[in-house]
Amino acid sequence: METKHYNVFVIGSGIAGQTAAKACVEAGLSVAISDKREFGGTCSTRGCDPKKVLIQFADLVQNSKQLENLGIKKTPKVKWKTVQKFKKSFTKPVPVNTEKTLKDLGIELYHQSPKFKNENELVVEGKTISADTFVIATGYVARDLEFEGADVLKTSDTILKLKKIPKSAVFIGSGYVGMEFCYMLSTLGCRVTMVEVGERALAPFDAFLVEKLTEVLEKNGVKFIFNAIPTKVEKRKKNKKLTYKKDGKTKTVKALKIFNTAGRVPAIDKLDLENANIKADETGILVNDFMQSVSHENVYACGDVSSKSLPLTPLSGLQGYIAGHNIVNGNKKEFQDPLVPSVVFTKPQLASVGYSEEEAKSRYKNVIVYKGDASKWYNAKKENAEAYAYKILVNERTKKIVGAHLLSSQANETINIFTTAINNDMTVDDFKRMIFTYPSYANDLKSMLKDED
């Protein structure tokens, strides 16, 4: 079998892989990139971008529900087939445009997931490929669940392609993926049950705000079952049945659809990493600050699959840039964890940046906690919103803001203001001196820094 050689071979065509590949080819290196799925990566084809297109329709319905009998006569109906057609106008062009862009740059494409043969070679499309450097940017995949019948469970890919809104659905797992789709389907008329092994939903987010969000979803018909361990899924004639254990008892719940939203894991199982001496664990490919494998100097990993990442698109792009730069110029750029906000796109939205309350109190001797329910404030009342709350964390010694957690209809935007404040080491007084538009959610942020918890 003839061996083809490249300077750089990239595995994965999402933002991280593309960014690294482009940096290398623009420096004159020969580059190839492979992907077993459509080119463009998760976010733009089957993740955050199409999700936001769909969820905005749930937002419109929810906004109308909140104002029903206050001027809105009737909550609008959503034509789901038309919505899906609109979504496809965003996702369908991505693979074609991505491939054209890469080809125009001189990058060769492979449409299969490769397997490492040894430290210097891999096999893809029946061909043996050697490279001076390999870049692994394969992202995340849904976590496999290991109980009877789990193989019939559908994932977020299926939710994004639903031909119609099911009458009933069960989600196994209440992380951000599960909560976002739970909100979307329940708002559009689906009877939703959330089954969670933990004590609450959204474990990484602030408990005070998560409780309020959970209460809103419950008021809108979502049933939460916590401390529940799934044990079996069965296909029935008209529906599916999930069996779970809770408080020592075996219980069941039935629905037309049952989804696996129990988290995502690095997509590395099928790469045969052990053949190439590439070390990895549950966090992904183990890398140093240069995004270089700790066990193989000619391998770099970036994006969700690296051990230094979070499942956030801006971070993937940054890591791809650093990996590409270091391949071209030698290890000169180090990855330093930037301040990255995160958002759960429910209604209300839950957003977070900086330290949690627990993290702040473990890092600083004294922490001021500004915490409150803002549901009686003007901006919430004019929307007839069911919840609006916040928690802001301040280092008492320096008076600098070190963490912010928001629950509101505009949290995905207003959290960026706190991101800017923390990045610029702003104190509470600095922040209060700023002038924002009024009346706006941005202006509310200053009022959050008045009364300590």
PLM region spans:
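FAD-site-proximal beta/loop scaffold in flavoenzymes
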Residues: A150-P166, T252-N329
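A conserved FAD-binding loop/helix module that cradles the flavin
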Residues: C302-E359, Y438-D453
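A structured beta-alpha segment of the ubiquitous adenosine-cofactor-binding alpha/beta core
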Residues: E125-K127, P230-T231, Y244-T252, R264
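Glycine-rich dinucleotide-binding loop and its adjacent helix/turn
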Residues: C48, T138-R191, V195, K223-F224, ...
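Glycine-rich flavin
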Residues: E2-Y6, K22-I165, T193, G198-L202, ...
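Beta1/beta-strand and adjacent pyrophosphate-binding region of the FAD-binding site
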Residues: E2-G14, I165-I172
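Flexible, glycine-rich terminal cap/loop adjacent to redox cofactors
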Residues: F9-A16, A20-R37, D49, V53-L60, ...
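Short hydrophobic core segments
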Residues: F9-I11, P114, I129-G139, I172, ...
